[in-house]
C-alpha cells in the first residue's frame, strides 16, 4: 500500500521518469508480441497462423504501430529520460509543475488502457495506424473499438502536451540570469525542440480525430464525400502531425547520443553550435514537408516539386550532425566503453534509413514504392533501429546511476551483436521485397516472395531470443535484490526476537522469504516455457518452409 501511494502520488521527477520508463517498456513488449505474430503470419503463404483472419491481421498492424509510436518510444524519450534528466541538467530540483507532471503520467496510462480496450473490443480496429476515414468510417467499421482508438489518441495527446508544457516551463523558467542559450547541453536542446513541436502539432491531430469521431457518431460529413466532405483533408491534418512525429521521436535521441559522446570523450561534441542550429533547422523544415506522404492523392506538379525539394533539404542539417559525430569519434581520445558500440550502431542504422529516405523524396520513385515494404524498411531503420538503439545506448549509459551493479562485458557484447544481426535480418530484406512490389497490410502474397519473407522470421526469432535473455537478466538482478532485501529483513527480525522474545517477526520474515523465492522460481519456469515456444516455432517454420519449397 505504501509503495502504491509512493508511485501514484509522487511528484518527484525522478520517480515519474522511472515509472514512464517501466510502463513504456511493458508497452513495447506488448507491441513486440504483436509484431512477432505479424512476422509469423507473413512467413507462410495462404492460411497462416491466423487461419486466414485478415481482419485480425490488420488489427495486429494497427495495434503494433500505435503502441510502438505513442506508447513506447515517445514515453521513453520524453517521459522517461527528459523527466529524469532535464531538471538536473538545468540545475533545478524538480519540474516547474510537478503535479501536472504526475497527471500527465496517469493520462498516459489511461490512453494506453483505451488502446488495449480497442484491441479487445468486438472485432478490433483493423484500420491501420494512420486512421484514414475510408477505413474507419461507420460504414466499414461500426465497432466501438475505433472510438476507443480515437479516445486513446486524445488521452495520449493530452499527456504529451502537458509533459511538453512542463519541460518548456522548466527549461525557460529555471534559466539563470546572464545564462547563454548556447551552453545548454544538446540533450536539453533536443528536449526543448521536441516539446515545442508537440505543442504545435498535437492540437492539429486532436482536431482531425475529433472530426472523425463526429463523423462516426453525430451524423456529420467532414470526411464524407457524399455530404460535401473531403477525404484528403484528414490526410493533411494527420500528416501535419505525422511527419514532425519522426523528429519528435529522434531529436531527444540525438541529444542522448551527443551526451554519451561528450561524457566518454571528456569534451564537447565537435562544433556544438552547428549541432544546435542543425536541430533547429530540422525542426523548422520538418513542419513543411508533411505532404510528401501524399504524392499519390492527385497533387499538382508544383506542390510535388516543393515538398520533394524541402524533403531533400532536410538531409543537409542531418548530414551536419552525422559528420560532427564521426569527427568527434575520429579526432578525440575517447574512453572505450560499451555504450560507444550502441552509438556506432545508431549512426550506421540512421544513415541507412536516411539514404532510403532520399530515394523516397523523389516523386517518381515514391509513387512506385508507395504502400510497399520498401517504405516499411525505411521508417523502421530510422525508428526501430535508429531511435530504439539510441535509447538502448542511453539506458546502458545511465544504468549505473539507477542500479548499483556492473554487467559482464561478454553478455553486453552478446546483447549488441544479437541485436545487430537480428534486426538487420528482419528489416534489410524488406528493401528488396518492396522493390519487387510486395504490398503492405496484406497477409497473403505470391510464392515468389516466400523465401525472403520467411527469412525475416529467423531474425525475428533471434530478437525474441534476445528479449527472453533480457528477461533472464532482469530476473537475475531482481533475484540478488530480493536476496539482499530479505537477508536484511531476516537479520532485523532476529534482532527484534532477541530483544522482545517473540516469534512473530521471524515467522513473517520466513513467510515472505518463501513466497518471494517461489515467485522467482515461477519466473524462471515461465522463461523456460518461452524458450521452448521459440524453438518450437523455429522448427515448425523450418519444416513447413522445406515442405513448401
Curated annotation (Swiss-Prot):
There is a cross-link at residues 243-247 (1'-histidyl-3'-tyrosine (His-Tyr)). Mg(2+) binds at residues 370-371. The chain crosses the membrane at residues 18-38, 59-79, 100-120, 148-168, 181-201, 237-257, 279-299, 310-330, 340-360, 379-399, 410-430, 460-480, 495-515, 527-547. Keywords: Calcium, Copper, Electron transport, Heme, Iron, Magnesium, Membrane, Metal-binding, Mitochondrion, Mitochondrion inner membrane, Respiratory chain, Translocase, Transmembrane, Transmembrane helix, Transport. It is a multi-pass membrane protein. The keyword Phosphoprotein does not apply. This is Cytochrome c oxidase subunit 1. It comes from Trypanosoma brucei brucei.
